Amino acid sequence: MSTQVLIVGGGIGGLTLAAMCRRIGVSCRVLERSAALEPVGAGISLAPNALRALDQIGLYDYVRQEGQPVRKIRVYRNQTQWSEIDFQWLERTFGYPVYSIERHGFHRRLYDAAGGSETVNLGAEVAKVIPPQEEAEGVSVVLKDGRRYTGNVLVGADGVRSVVRRALMATINSPPGQSGAVGEDEDAADVIQFTGRVHLSGYTHPLDHLGPADEGIAYWMLYDRSILTTWPCRDHRQWFVGAVPSKLKDPNRSVWKHADHNTINQVYGSEYHPFAPDFHFRDVVKHAERVVASDVFHQTTFPPMAAGRIAMLGDASHAMTSFFGQGACQAIEDATELASALGMIDVRPTDAETILQGYRHSRERRGRDLVVFSDRFALLHTGRLLGSWGPFVRQMVYTWMPLWGWKWALQWLYGHQPTLVEQRNEAAKKTA
């Protein structure tokens, strides 16, 4: 079965790319290993650098309807409030605020925008990637059940343990004309590393004791032995995520099985939180409709984001910690730039490899910068930046940094807003 673009992975990045391909008339097929779209994760943060692209494909109205804009972030050290960071200026400056939204609902909406079952094959686990042996051929994948798909371009959106990334590396390392099939069990130099931390997160039912004054207020809680963030969501729901050192002997898994409310309470149940009815976080955890525990990985080396007719996006290319909520946003940025490139390939198919190299060069520096930024912010937030000076540096930043400092620090992040090539062409026509 052939198509213009084969996308391996039906997460945020893969489905965003598929929705954009559909928008510009490029045929695609998404292969997702999960058998169903089940709730995975808790919440998601969508910032201005991703929202402009979502606005272009008609998804911003959904985000506005189902999400909650963040107005302020209150920073606490144990029970003492250090500061309140204003976020209401973001929309005036960048055109969009930061939204917190329930992840599964947003994922389902992306699935629909991508074309649903007409585009997305669920239960389609890739076992082998077969690169082209001649320039005119496409790239093929073979599923575990034996089905075979071929595309003019193959895109890896399959996360930190990407089978497509291994195929891309094999394409780079093999002599011309000798690149063979690459399977999921092939040995390859690992480019991701376990950070030693586990994220404990959850998404609550509406908290009836919260009122209008609580809308849009996030909390950064800096405890002695852990940290915790609560993000406001629609209808006074809360998305919480904490980070603690992991005690696992085997860090080779991403999502823990059998995590429950007690998993969260063992770490955070007795900790102070300003909006908990008795000021203990267990009173929030008991309202969680689901909880998740997952190990945290980040990128250590960066393979090229494109080689031959294979391209990468999101965590498959630049896995990062979630300390500033940019993982999904960067996948959306990647998808926007890649969709623009795929639109060009649709017009000039013989230039596919050259055009993908253009995508590679437009995204690699940005992705690497975000990995470094996320790592450094994690060090700042946990009081470990600059070694023994870490606690002092953290307190100085969170208690003394003026608003103009935050505006300066976030300009490079939120001011970068990729646009789909279709929209660029329309803008050029209007100004011509």
Swiss-Prot record:
Q: What is its EC number?
A: 1.-.-.-
List the coiled-coil residues.
none
Recorded phenotype for the gene knockout or disruption: Leads to the accumulation of pyranonigrin I.
Q: Where does FAD bind?
A: 32, 103, 315, 328
Claim: Lipid metabolism is one of the keywords in the record: no
Role of this protein: FAD-dependent monooxygenase; part of the gene cluster that mediates the biosynthesis of pyranonigrins, a family of antioxidative compounds. The first step of pyranonigrins biosynthesis is performed by the hybrid PKS-NRPS synthetase that condenses 6 malonyl-CoA units to an acetyl starter unit, to form a 1,3,5-trioxotetradecane-6,8-dienyl-ACP. The enoyl reductase (ER) domain of pynA is likely to be functional during the first two rounds of polyketide chain extension, to generate the saturated C-C bonds of the alkyl side chain.
The entry's family comment says: Belongs to the paxM FAD-dependent monooxygenase family.
This protein's name: FAD-dependent monooxygenase pynG
According to its UniProt entry, this protein's organism is Aspergillus niger (strain ATCC MYA-4892 / CBS 513.88 / FGSC A1513)
